[in-house]
UniProtKB/Swiss-Prot annotation:
Quaternary data: Homodimer.
Record gene name: xpt
Keywords assigned by UniProt, alphabetized: Cytoplasm, Glycosyltransferase, Purine salvage, Transferase
Protein name in the entry: Xanthine phosphoribosyltransferase
Binding positions for 5-phospho-alpha-D-ribose 1-diphosphate per the UniProt entry: A128, N129, G130, Q131, A132
Species lineage: Bacteria, Bacillati, Bacillota, Bacilli, Bacillales
Similarity comment text for this entry: Belongs to the purine/pyrimidine phosphoribosyltransferase family. Xpt subfamily.
Length: 197
């Protein structure tokens, strides 16, 4: 997605060979126009999948998920990382290790909002080692719902998360695939199909 790649190049900051900071438009400050375009792109890619619900994880996955849900006409349910006084019982639970925060979180979804009749699109901001996506898949599978695919805003293709998910037969659609963050420079995976001008 060209507009996203341009945003990453112009406003993203490479902090190391593994870490890209995109807090200027995605995971702290949010660019709503960009999120709207991201939502439209996810909806376009998954429009034939009969999605009934989008599942994401708090908090950075919420904005792109809501925009995609608006386009698809479905609801969003986000996995919580912290226990809530109002959501204590009747939960699906999974453990997820965060590479960025170097900690394991117990994530949960209420059983009241997802069931075996749902066809789910999972959306997240980043895909690196795949732990968040695997945790979300576990929650969806515990509910008996089917997974239509996973939409990722930015995939670090040089890490093994995407490979792990695809090897399990999961459809993964990434809007920006990064081949490398070496030497403080973002290098994107070359698309196999050239854009028609």
């Amino acid at each position: 997605m060209k507009v996203l790649q341009e945003k990453i190049l112009n406003e993203g900051k490479v902090l190391s060979g593994d870490v890209l900071k995109v807090d200027a438009f995605l995971n702290h400050q949010i660019d709503p126009v960009l999120m709207q375009e991201i939502g439209k792109e996810f909806a376009k890619r998954f429009k034939e999948e009969n999605i009934t619900k989008i599942v994401t994880i708090e908090s950075s996955g919420i904005a792109p998920s809501v925009m995609a849900a608006l386009e698809l006409g479905v609801k969003v349910i986000f996995a919580r990382k912290r226990k809530s006084l109002t959501l204590q019982d009747n939960m699906y639970v999974a453990n997820v290790y965060s590479f960025t925060k170097q900690e394991t979180n117990e994530i949960s979804l209420s059983r009241n909002h997802i069931d075996e009749n749902d066809r789910v699109l999972i959306i997240d901001d980043f895909l690196a080692n795949g732990q968040a996506a695997l945790g979300l898949m576990s929650l969806v599978e515990q509910a008996g719902a089917s997974i239509a695919g996973i939409g990722i805003v930015i995939e670090k293709a040089f890490q093994d998360g995407g490979k792990k998910l695809r090897e399990q037969g999961v459809r993964v659609e990434s809007l920006a695939e990064i081949a490398s963050l070496d030497n403080g420079t973002v290098t994107f995976v070359q698309q196999e199909t050239a854009e028609v001008k």
